[in-house]
Regions:
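Glycine-rich beta-alpha-beta "Rossmann" dinucleotide-binding loop(s) and their flanking helix/strand
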Residues: 84, 93, 97-123, 208-224
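Short amphipathic alpha-helical segments
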Residues: 2-3, 25-26, 105-109, 148-150, ...
């Protein structure tokens, strides 16, 4: 949107989310980001807010909570129709979909939906709710490692992954391993198999490690 504004091109932005900001706003508004030029650290929401301020002078029009359903050629250029019936005529269409619509990466557990938004969360939108709680973070990518490192500052965090090798950035992996060596993070090699209710609003996670099935009781499960 910003680059189009510099070219004096008025922009309509269509997004399936209910807010502007994509991944930063939807998946990790409170997650510290360290790889933005000139910014030692910035949260996803702070970055989103600053980018919105940057494009405001160009007065883009946002169409949220909808997606493109149909594109037709017209005499003028193109007619785009969204899932709520909005029609936009434009000379050109730019697809900047990133990873596409966000779908939580759910572990293949039959009853996991019973615990969603209670004990199971697929994104961290409010870090304070996890303070002084026992967390199990599942995954081996950047989000899993970054949140393990960040939430360990104020929570009891265990990371579980099916193997000891990770997809995350080497720096994040190194920091997690250092925290583990200091006793600030625990690591389990295994695969989650089942969830059941525990004591005092907690949940019990059953996981398979090699040939063994073990249990761990936690307040929250965060699969990434």
């Amino acid at each position: 949107v910003f680059e189009l504004g510099l070219l004096n091109i008025h922009c309509h932005l269509i997004d399936n989310l209910d807010k502007v900001g994509g991944q930063c706003a939807e998946l990790y508004p409170e997650k510290p980001i360290y790889d933005i030029p000139s910014r030692p650290v910035v949260t996803g929401q702070e970055l989103t807010d600053e980018l919105i301020k940057q494009i405001n002078p160009f007065k883009p029009k946002f169409h949220l909570n909808q997606q493109v359903d149909k594109i037709d050629k017209s005499e003028y250029g193109w007619i785009v129709e969204t899932s709520v019936g909005v029609k936009i005529e434009a000379k050109c269409i730019i697809i900047a979909a990133g990873a596409g619509s966000f779908v939580p990466r759910k572990p293949p557990i039959e009853n996991i939906d019973q615990f969603e938004n209670k004990n199971v969360f697929y994104a961290v939108r409010n870090k304070s709710m996890f303070e002084n709680k026992k967390l199990l973070i599942a995954g081996g990518g950047d989000s899993a490692l970054d949140w393990t490192n960040e939430l360990s500052k104020s929570s009891n965090v265990t990371l579980i992954h099916r193997r000891k090798e990770f997809r995350a950035a080497p720096d994040s992996v190194g920091r997690m391993q250092e925290l583990e060596s200091q006793g600030k993070v625990s690591f389990l090699k295994g695969t989650i198999k089942n969830i059941k209710r525990g004591s005092e609003n907690k949940i019990v996670i059953s996981y398979q490690s090699d040939e063994n099935i073990n249990d761990i009781e936690v307040d929250y499960l965060l699969p990434f």
